[in-house]
Structure formats: structure tokens, C-alpha cells
């Protein structure tokens, strides 16, 4: 990565396609990609649910922010966890970044993707109403820091890819 260029940072609720889209774009453009959740699991040798269980959500949010700071100058594309905006430090840090892309999706589709996924501690055993409440509570924050929003349930991966390519070219990056 050219360190003078800002990474593309994918934000959005869990299950909206941040990791899938990030990896796809990185593979297609031969760019570096880091999924913050995977990075945390590799670095700390614990799964996200194990971290939540052993240390709590606040501890995890602190790790998430620390890892985002570590990765900000080393990756071309970064997929964040859906709750990264819950931390004031991370939220304020992201506000100062340039290429924040918000991937959004219909809550019914999100629910079908993540319902009973044991790797998602904030979704586990939640009703669609509980998940929707969490989703709604985060949307204002995503909107506040996003440079561009894509509805991943309305666009295919390749359509989002081409839209991102146009953004990259428009900002003369990579």
C-alpha cells in the first residue's frame, strides 16, 4: 500500500457483506485486505465470542479500536466489525478517515444471514425485533461517518465492486 493513500474502510451492520465485498475487491484489484475481526482472532488466539465471554464487550471494543489503528496504514481495504462505531474512540477516529463506505442491507435479509450464527455474539439468540433495535441504534452513526452508502441487498457483489472502482478512480487512489 502507498502510505500516502487512505484505505477504503467498510462499515455497516453485521451480515451486510463487508468481509465478502472487501475480499472480492482486494482480490480483483490485487490490493491488501484486512478483516478486523479475523485480525483480532489471529492476534489474540481467541474467537470473538470467546473474547466477549471472557472479557466482555467493552474489552472487545477496545481491542477492535487498537487493531484498527494498527491496520490503518498497512491495508488498502479494511472491513470493520459492525459494532466498531459503539466505541467513541473508534467512532471519532473513523470520522477523520476519508474513504468510509457503508454497506447496508434489509434487516430481514440480515436476520436470515446471521440468525443463530455462533460467531456473532451480539446476534446470538436475538429476535428479529431485538436485532432491528440494535440495527436502528447504529444507523445514525454509520450515516454520520460514511462517504458513500451501498445497499448490498439491492446490488450484486460485482455491481458494488464497479461502484467502488469508480470511487477509487475518482479519488485517484491505488
UniProtKB/Swiss-Prot annotation:
Residues annotated for Mg(2+) binding in this entry: 19
Cofactor(s) required, per the database record: Mg(2+)
Gene3D superfamilies with a match to the protein in the record: P-loop containing nucleotide triphosphate hydrolases (3.40.50.300)
Catalytic reaction(s) noted: shikimate + ATP = 3-phosphoshikimate + ADP + H(+)
Record's GO cellular component terms: cytosol
Primary location class: cytoplasm
Manner of cofactor binding, per the entry note: Binds 1 Mg(2+) ion per subunit.
Molecular functions (GO terms): ATP binding; magnesium ion binding; shikimate kinase activity
Keyword entries, A-Z: Amino-acid biosynthesis, Aromatic amino acid biosynthesis, ATP-binding, Cytoplasm, Kinase, Magnesium, Metal-binding, Nucleotide-binding, Transferase
Positions with a binding annotation for ATP: 15-20, 120
Pathway: Metabolic intermediate biosynthesis; chorismate biosynthesis; chorismate from D-erythrose 4-phosphate and phosphoenolpyruvate: step 5/7
Source superkingdom: Bacteria
Enzyme class: transferase
EC number of the protein: 2.7.1.71
UniProt xrefs under Pfam families: SKI
Family (UniProt): Belongs to the shikimate kinase family.
Self-association and partners: Monomer.
Protein name: Shikimate kinase
Gene encoding the protein: aroK
Amino acid at each position: 500500500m502507498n502510505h500516502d493513500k487512505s484505505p477504503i474502510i467498510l462499515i455497516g451492520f453485521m451480515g451486510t457483506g463487508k468481509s465478502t465485498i472487501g475480499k472480492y475487491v482486494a482480490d480483483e484489484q490485487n490490493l491488501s485486505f484486512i478483516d478486523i475481526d479475523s485480525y483480532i482472532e489471529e492476534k489474540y488466539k481467541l474467537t470473538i465470542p470467546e473474547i466477549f465471554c471472557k472479557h466482555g464487550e467493552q474489552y472487545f471494543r477496545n481491542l477492535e479500536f487498537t487493531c484498527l489503528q494498527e491496520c490503518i496504514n498497512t491495508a488498502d481495504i479494511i472491513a470493520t466489525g459492525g459494532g466498531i462505531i459503539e466505541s467513541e474512540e473508534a467512532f471519532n477516529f473513523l470520522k477523520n478517515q476519508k474513504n468510509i463506505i457503508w454497506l447496508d442491507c434489509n434487516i430481514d435479509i440480515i436476520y436470515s444471514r446471521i440468525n443463530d450464527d455462533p460467531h456473532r455474539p451480539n446476534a446470538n439468540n436475538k429476535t428479529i425485533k431485538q436485532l432491528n433495535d440494535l440495527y436502528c441504534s447504529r444507523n445514525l452513526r454509520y450515516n454520520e461517518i460514511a462517504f458513500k452508502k451501498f445497499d448490498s441487498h439491492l446490488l450484486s457483489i460485482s455491481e458494488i465492486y464497479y461502484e467502488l472502482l469508480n470511487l477509487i478512480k475518482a479519488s485517484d487512489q491505488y
